Curated annotation (Swiss-Prot):
Any single biological process term in GO: toxin catabolic process
Domain of life: Eukaryota
Organism lineage string: Eukaryota, Metazoa, Spiralia, Lophotrochozoa, Mollusca
Function statement: Hydrolysis of sulfocarbamoyl esters of paralytic shellfish toxins. Does not hydrolyze the carbamoyl esters of paralytic shellfish toxins.
Signal peptide: none
Keyword terms of this UniProt record: Hydrolase
GO MF term (any one): hydrolase activity, acting on ester bonds
Tissue expression pattern: Ubiquitous (at protein level). Highest levels of expression in crystalline style followed by digestive gland and mantle.
UniProt note on regulation of activity: Strongly inhibited by the serine proteinase inhibitor AEBSF. Weakly inhibited by the proteinase inhibitors BSF and aprotinin, and by EDTA.
Protein name (Swiss-Prot/TrEMBL): Sulfocarbamoylase-1
Length: 94
């Protein structure tokens, strides 16, 4: 079963660390994300999940805990949503 992961209901419009909770940092707009990509990501410390897709502007509209480069490397390595979900399950439950 695949759970729907909601986007932040109140998107941030400025890349301002003051908008982030403790331990978070802004989404970095210089990360290469292709238009149309859907990325399901996990927090490295906490099991925080978020989605980046074509409907999200490529600026800081939410804050993240995860290491973005680790996340993107994982996405490209596994290649598909199903494989990514399995990889997430393996990381979170091992």
């Amino acid at each position: 079963t695949t759970e729907e992961v909601p986007l932040n209901p109140e998107p941030r419009t400025e890349c301002d660390s003051d908008n982030c909770a403790a331990g978070e940092r802004p989404y970095a707009p210089n990360i290469a994300i292709e238009n149309g990509d859907t990325i399901i990501a996990i927090g490295v410390v906490a099991d925080v999940m978020f989605v980046i897709d074509x409907n999200c502007p490529l600026y800081c509209n939410f804050c993240i805990v995860a290491d973005v480069m680790f996340v993107i490397d994982l996405v490209y390595e596994v290649g598909s949503f199903e494989a990514l979900q399995q990889a997430i399950d393996n990381i979170m439950f091992t």
